[in-house]
C-alpha cells in the first residue's frame, strides 16, 4: 500500500517478517526470485533490489511476462520485491511506477519503505562508465523503442524532500545504487580506460559521489538514527562501519539481511 505524505511516497509492508537487500541483477528476475524463494527458502520477506534491475532494455510487455512467470512463486512464499533504479535502468520505469504489482514493483527516488520496524530511504542512480559505448549503440536505429543508456541516469540531491523526510521520519536504513565518496570503491583504476574516450567521465563520477556525500551529511546532521546503508553498482562485496553506520556494498545478486536492532 502506498500513499502521498507531503510529496513523500511511502510503501508499507506490515506482513513482512524479514527484509533483505540485493545487489544488481541486470535483468535476471527469475534467477533472483528462485534464489529468494527456493534456494534460500525465504518466506514472509521483503527484498529490495539496489538498482541495475534491467528495465528499459526490452519492450514493456516483456516485464509483464516476467511477472507472470514469477508471481506464483512470490505469492506462495509470501514474499515481495521492491526495486530502485540504477544507471542501467530507464528512470521512467521508476518515476512513473510502471511496474506496480503488489508483490513486484519499481519505486521512485526518495521513496520511504517501512517493514519489520525499519524505515528505509531508497535513492537510485549512478554514472555509466561505459556510456560512450552505450551512446554509440543507441545512436543506431531501434524499431522496438528500447535503449541501453539514459541521460538522466545520475542521482540527484533534493533538499526539499530530504527536509520533509527529516521532519516526518526516523530513517534507520538507506538503500542507494552508488555510495558516498568515503566508501569503496575508491580506486579509479577501472575508469581510466573509458576516461580516455570520455573527457568528462572522471568529473561526473566525482559529482555522483559528492551528491551521495550531501545526502549522507543531511541525514547525519539531522540526527537520523542511521544504522545500515546498502548499495550495489560496483560489482564487489565490502562492509565497514563508518561514523557509526554499517555500510555494505553488494556484489551482483548478493543478498544481505537488514538486521533488527
Locations of the language-model features?
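Core catalytic region of metal-dependent phosphoesterases/phosphodiesterases
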Residues: 22, 27-116, 193-195, 201, ...
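Active-site neighborhood of phospho(di)ester-bond hydrolases with catalytic His/Asp-centered motifs
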Residues: 21-23, 47-52, 80-88, 106-108, ...
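A short, compositionally biased domain-edge/stem linker segment
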Residues: 2-12
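Active-site-proximal loop/helix segment associated with metal-binding centers of metalloenzymes
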Residues: 118-210
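Extreme N-terminal starter segment of soluble prokaryotic enzymes
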Residues: 15-20
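Short catalytic/ligand-binding loop motif for oxyanion handling, primarily in non-cytosolic enzymes
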Residues: 28-30, 56-58, 90-94, 113-116, ...
Amino acid at each position: 500500500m502506498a500513499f502521498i505524505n507531503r510529496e513523500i511516497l511511502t510503501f508499507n509492508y506490515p506482513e513482512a517478517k524479514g527484509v533483505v537487500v540485493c545487489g544488481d541483477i541486470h535483468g535476471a528476475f527469475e534467477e533472483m526470485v528462485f534464489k529468494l524463494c527456493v534456494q534460500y527458502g525465504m518466506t514472509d520477506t521483503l527484498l529490495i533490489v539496489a538498482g541495475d534491475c534491467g528495465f528499459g532494455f526490452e519492450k514493456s510487455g516483456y516485464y509483464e511476462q516476467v511477472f507472470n512467470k514469477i508471481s506464483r512463486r512470490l505469492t506462495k512464499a509470501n514474499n515481495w520485491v521492491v526495486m530502485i533504479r540504477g544507471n542501467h535502468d530507464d528512470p521512467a520505469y521508476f518515476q512513473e511506477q510502471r511496474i506496480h504489482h503488489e508483490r513486484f514493483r519499481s519505486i521512485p527516488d526518495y521513496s520511504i519503505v517501512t517493514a519489520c520496524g525499519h524505515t528505509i530511504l531508497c535513492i537510485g542512480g549512478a554514472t555509466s562508465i561505459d556510456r560512450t559505448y552505450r551512446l554509440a549503440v543507441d545512436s543506431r536505429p531501434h524499431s522496438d523503442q528500447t535503449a541501453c543508456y539514459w541521460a538522466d541516469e545520475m542521482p540527484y540531491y533534493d533538499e526539499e524532500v530530504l527536509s520533509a523526510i527529516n521532519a516526518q521520519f526516523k530513517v534507520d536504513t538507506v538503500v542507494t545504487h552508488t555510495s558516498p565518496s568515503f566508501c569503496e570503491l575508491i580506486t579509479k583504476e577501472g575508469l581510466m580506460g573509458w576516461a580516455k574516450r570520455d573527457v568528462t567521465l572522471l568529473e561526473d563520477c566525482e559529482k555522483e559521489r559528492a551528491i551521495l556525500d550531501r545526502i549522507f551529511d543531511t541525514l547525519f546532521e539531522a540526527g537520523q538514527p542511521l544504522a545500515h546503508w546498502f548499495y550495489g553498482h560496483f560489482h564487489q562485496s565490502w562492509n565497514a562501519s563508518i561514523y557509526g553506520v554499517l555500510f555494505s556494498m553488494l556484489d551482483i545478486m548478493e543478498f544481505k539481511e537488514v538486521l533488527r536492532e
